[in-house]
């Protein structure tokens, strides 16, 4: 029997199509035809968590670069995440925010991305500035105050920081504690106050906070008076080190420090306390997802977990301030939370921090150097 060439070609084409469809079905079932990372990060469907879990099982790991204290916060986060998602290995690397973003950016430029997620004070906006962040959606931030959230989804807040003064209780009498920025101009504090230089959340944030809250004219008039107080420019260590110097009596008052640090030391018997002033400068540590990440499903599970009530509770117990309004801070630290202290708050978001830091540094150099 002689088979016509056209019939043969038709059967061959049908066989090819069926084989292709069968392979496609197998590949889809195996996850090889999964959504793009961008689609995964922005997925909002009702089956979102299940899709993330299925994808994370295939990925098997996730990497975060974070500024969280390792034993105090990151390890409990890793333990809790591991119990909830035992099929995902979490790898962490700790450094300060600037180093974290620099390392992640270098990886992106080299097309050798290791980090899936970066976290730290200002890290989100720095990642945006470095063009290494990409948008993501997480339902965990729905209950967060709108002021703390990024409308583009390029970062999400993980924890808050409140700034105030630390003062030595042996050197500053209770009735002499400065309770306003104007009271810092009292001549008795001339040469007895210090602030931290070399950090965006040190001297520049002090100046930025008042520039935003008061306006440039009023703030500059105040700075012109403040310069006569001969504030000591402290550059020999971290904000925590500066508080320790206050405890030691080297300085009577430290300006614009993390207000919970002196409270932690006070609880241990140190002669130090904190005072917040109107307006209280507030910043947020933020979390971004890195362009070119290899584990998008697991990265979203990790982001969801850190921002969940469980994750926020872990951070609260680690002496951080949660962003979730339903998660309370530790009672010993609560007095410096603006809404509890009854003092107005000025949230200096990552975008504002970056926008104002250079010009505030210029003011510092001209007036206080």
Predicted regions and their residues:
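Immediate post-signal peptide segment of exported/extracytoplasmic ligand-binding proteins
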Residues: 34-63, 82-83, 186-190
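Extracytoplasmic ligand-binding site segments that recognize negatively charged/polar headgroups
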Residues: 63-78, 90-108, 112-250
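A ligand-binding cleft/hinge motif common to bilobed small-molecule-binding domains
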Residues: 124-127, 252-271
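Periplasmic-binding protein-like
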Residues: 146-147, 160-163, 191-199, 223-229, 233-236, 306-329, ...
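A bilobed periplasmic-binding-protein/Venus flytrap-type ligand-binding module shared by bacterial periplasmic
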Residues: 164-171, 207-212, 283-298, 314-315
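Extracellular/periplasmic bilobal clamshell ligand-binding domains
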Residues: 329-369
């Amino acid at each position: 029997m002689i088979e016509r060439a056209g019939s043969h070609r038709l059967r061959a084409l049908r066989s090819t199509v069926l084989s292709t469809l069968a392979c496609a079905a197998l590949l889809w079932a195996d996850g090889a035809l999964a959504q793009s990372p961008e689609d995964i990060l922005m997925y909002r469907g009702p089956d979102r968590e299940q899709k993330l879990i299925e994808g994370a099982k295939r990925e098997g790991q996730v990497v975060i670069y974070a500024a969280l204290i390792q034993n105090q916060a990151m390890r409990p986060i890793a333990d809790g995440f591991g119990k909830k998602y035992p099929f995902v290995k979490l790898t962490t690397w700790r450094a300060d925010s600037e180093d974290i973003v620099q390392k992640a950016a270098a990886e992106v430029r080299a097309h050798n991305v290791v980090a899936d997620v970066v976290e730290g004070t200002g890290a989100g906006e720095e990642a945006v500035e470095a063009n290494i962040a990409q948008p993501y959606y997480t339902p965990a931030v729905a209950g967060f105050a709108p002021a703390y959230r990024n409308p583009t989804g390029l970062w999400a807040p993980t924890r808050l920081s409140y700034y105030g003064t630390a003062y030595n209780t042996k050197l500053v009498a209770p009735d002499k504690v400065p309770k306003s920025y104007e009271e810092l101009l009292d001549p008795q504090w001339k040469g007895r106050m210090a602030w931290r230089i070399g950090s965006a959340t040190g001297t520049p944030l002090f100046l930025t906070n008042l520039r935003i809250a008061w306006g440039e004219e009023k703030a500059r008039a105040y700075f012109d008076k403040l310069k006569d107080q001969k504030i000591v420019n402290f550059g020999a260590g971290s904000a925590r080190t500066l508080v320790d110097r206050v405890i030691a009596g080297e300085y009577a008052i430290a300006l614009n420090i993390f207000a919970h640090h002196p409270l932690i030391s006070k609880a241990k018997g140190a002669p130090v306390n904190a005072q917040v002033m109107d307006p209280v400068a507030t910043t947020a540590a933020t979390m971004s997802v890195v362009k070119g990440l290899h584990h998008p499903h697991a990265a979203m599970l990790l982001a969801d977990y850190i921002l969940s009530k469980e994750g926020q509770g872990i951070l609260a117990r680690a002496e951080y301030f949660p962003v979730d309004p339903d998660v309370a801070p530790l009672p010993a630290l609560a007095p410096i939370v603006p809404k509890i202290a009854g003092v107005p708050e000025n949230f200096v978001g990552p975008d504002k921090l970056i926008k104002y830091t250079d010009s505030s540094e210029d003011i510092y150099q001209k007036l206080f150097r």
